[in-house]
Each structure stands twice: as C-alpha cells, then as structure tokens.
C-alpha cells in the first residue's frame, strides 16, 4: 500500500476577501499561515514524514509548504515547483468578488463557472496585464500552453502529465510524497484518482490547510482517503467553500 498526502494552501488574502484568484500571486493571511503550521503539526503528530514534495509556482502554495516543512523539521526536503499544479485560471473573473459576481450574473451561472467540469469563465484578452505571457515564472512554458481561462477539464489536462511523468513514478518507487497545491488543481487530481464523474465533481469542496491522505493500492487506485484533524470543523470548512460563490 502507498500513501499520498494532499494539502490545499492555507487561507489567502483573496480567499478572505472572497475574490476569484486563479493565477494571481496573492499571499497567505495570518490565519492561512496558522493553518499551514497546524497541518504540519497534525502530520508530525500522526507520524508522517516525506521524501519529496510538489507544489505550484504561486506563493500561497509555496509558503504553505514552507510552513509544513518548518513544523515537521523537513526544510531540507526536495521540492518540485510546477506551473501544472497552479490553481485553475479564472480568466476575466480574476480579482472579482464571488458574491458580487453572483449578484450580477446569478448564483447558477457562477456555480457553473466555479465548479462545472467543462465550462470556462470568459477569457482574458492576450494584452491584459493579468495574462501570464510576460511573467518570468512561465518563461520556459510554450506560449500555446499558457491559458487565458480554464475550466476544470483544462486543469485536469495540464495536471495529469505531471502526475503520470513524475508524481506517480515517485509514489511507485516507495517515496513518501506530499503535494501542496490549490483547490482546483487538487480537485483535478482527485477526479482522476477517484474516477469522479463530470457531473458529480461539482460537489467536491476542499478546505484550506487540511491534510488529505490517500491510501493507494499497487495500481495507485484509492483504497480509502481521509482528512486529518477535527472532522466537524473540516465539514464546516467544506460547507463554507461551497457557499463562496453565492450572492446571499
């Protein structure tokens, strides 16, 4: 049996402000830093250790990983930073308040943009300052692979090559792997691992800063998965994530 640990970054400044973030590189709040430290404490207390970690190129995930490493005394851990683990690109919604957007376009439309599998939000113009083309962290990524908007289907398509070519081989080699990423890049991976249908994935909400453990068989198929921590608090956090895109 193999184990894989996933963690969504701690609360970011735009999570706190209920704004669509996507590829915008916002930082953690004080609460977010505390969530990351608590995640590290939970993992250490439960006896976990790691051989390698994967994260995105966005600081809210990177800093979450730093705090987990610090709390676990694993600052030496090899880390792979990949744009493929970035949050889903929210296109022209990037920076907008979710509740205000829902009040303008309706809860149903915003739910489709936030959680449906194959409907992306309106795209950015290529000349928009939020477009990733001139960002140095993507200098080695072919321009045609850089998005101006994404649906979850697009996010799955960019996450899976990293899983197939790097993460899965590391797990099969017996390495203890930690992935610190984002709500939708993790939803993309979980959809693949658990075989969740395109329609059912809309109901999957991942709380900030809570370790999610996957136990996998020899074929890397899930045996079971579970969150570490207070289960009632985790359920409330998941419900709060689900409410973010509603007007009321």
Swiss-Prot record:
Binding site for substrate: 8-15, 21-22, 60, 87-90, 98, 114-115, 183-184
Single GO biological process annotation from the record: glycolytic process
Annotated EC: 5.4.2.11
Claim: Kinase is one of the keywords in the record: no
PROSITE patterns hit by this protein: PG_MUTASE
EC class: isomerase
A GO term, aspect molecular function: phosphoglycerate mutase activity
Membrane-spanning segments: none
Residues annotated as catalytic: 9 (tele-phosphohistidine intermediate), 87 (proton donor/acceptor)
A Pfam entry, by short name: His_Phos_1
The protein's annotated pathway: Carbohydrate degradation; glycolysis; pyruvate from D-glyceraldehyde 3-phosphate: step 3/5
Site location (Transition state stabilizer): 182
Keywords for this protein: Gluconeogenesis, Glycolysis, Isomerase
Reactions it catalyzes: (2R)-2-phosphoglycerate = (2R)-3-phosphoglycerate
Assembly and binders: Homodimer.
Protein task: Catalyzes the interconversion of 2-phosphoglycerate and 3-phosphoglycerate.
UniProt similarity note: Belongs to the phosphoglycerate mutase family. BPG-dependent PGAM subfamily.
NCBIfam families: pgm_1, PRK14115.1
HAMAP family assigned: PGAM_GpmA
Name the record gives this protein: 2,3-bisphosphoglycerate-dependent phosphoglycerate mutase
Origin species: Burkholderia vietnamiensis (strain G4 / LMG 22486) (Burkholderia cepacia (strain R1808))
